[in-house]
Amino acid sequence: MPRVFTGLPANYAAPTLALSLLLPLLLVVWTQLPVSARPSTGPDYLRRGWLRLLAEGEGCAPCRPEECAAPRGCLAGRVRDACGCCWECANLEGQLCDLDPSANFYGRCGEQLECRLDAGGDLSRGEVPEPLCVCRSQRPLCGSDGRTYAQICRLQEAARARLDANLTVVHPGPCESEPQILSQPHNIWNVTGQDVIFGCEVFAYPMASIEWRKDGLDIQLPGDDPHISVQFRGGPQKFEVTGWLQIQALRPSDEGTYRCLARNALGQAEASATLTVLTPEQLNATGFSQLQSRSLFPEEEEEAESEELGDYY
């Protein structure tokens, strides 16, 4: 007499049957989504969240490495997927990750990275710390391209993004460099009696000193002029220094070209900006629309901010 199993309910269906019914439903939902809501065709790590949601509830099939798709655009390296079979892109620095090694929703951090709770939020306002990938080392490094990188993780990202550059570590610590002006002073105009400020941000190693000068004067500002002041501070990043020149209660004689000069033992760099001073009568007679070309130049600001992309920070 055949053996009868009575421990399962009559309407029990095998998991594979449930999945076979669920997948067509997911396909219908997918086709109804707007294009903007679908995952992009970018690097694999950008699509992984969608793939995990679609695969939720599925078990691991027998591992067939020859059927695995090759991951691409993996700037943080590769890790095995939840089933330990195929390779997938590891998470980058700053991306969400799984604190529990047995979990696999957000994904695993890449080479030289570890998953830590981000304590930078404001807990008093109810912000919940999030697990993020953090580089194990925070020591700056000098790359073979002559650039200084904040730590090994940034250098490895750059190396994987530019494979033909053969980027390697030359030595720990920053590269020795003559001053590089990261943020230049900008041309500006204002009315007599008002205040203006020029700023200048410099990266260098050894550290640079900054001074301000005005064309036509042989002295370093502020000199003995009580309505001109200068200020300096370190930062905003390592091996950077920022200087400001403030002119209070503008006078017509303040008009001219001002220069930020940065020096260290390896060399110097400079950047200039023009100050135009108008009287109220000139402003009314000229009209603001005609002065826009002599105001701040957005194109110069964008160029200054993009000059050192990829370097250090």
Swiss-Prot record:
GO terms for biological process: cell differentiation; extracellular matrix organization; ossification; regulation of cell growth. InterPro entries: Growth_fac_rcpt_cys_sf, Ig-like_dom, Ig-like_dom_sf, Ig-like_fold, Ig_I-set, Ig_sub, Ig_sub2, IGFBP-like. The keyword Signal applies. CDD domains: KAZAL_FS. Involved in the proliferation of osteoblasts during bone formation and bone regeneration. Promotes matrix assembly. Residues 290-313 are annotated as: Disordered. This is Kazal-type serine protease inhibitor domain-containing protein 1. GO terms for molecular function: insulin-like growth factor binding.
